Amino acid sequence: MSQSISLNSQNRYEIKIYGQLDDSWLGWFGEDAKAHAEILADNSQVTRFSNVVMDQAGLVGLIRRLHGLGIVLISVRLGLFGRLNK
């Protein structure tokens, strides 16, 4: 049975930002989020946050907070498991 994604559904996301953020930022990304430091081909550093669980309003709020701090957003994608079964 396929599950639809809606504005109010809790979904799992992966968020990638330019630069390196340490684990002290994890609270912004949800209690189950994990941070992964990566190096791109041009030797620039990025941080990938996986297992970010929130609804669309939470996601938009997070993106606004990052933008307000001047943090460059590289990508946001729906995680492998998509919508959570609750």
Segments predicted by a language model, with ranges:
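Long, contiguous binding/interaction regions
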Residues: 1-86
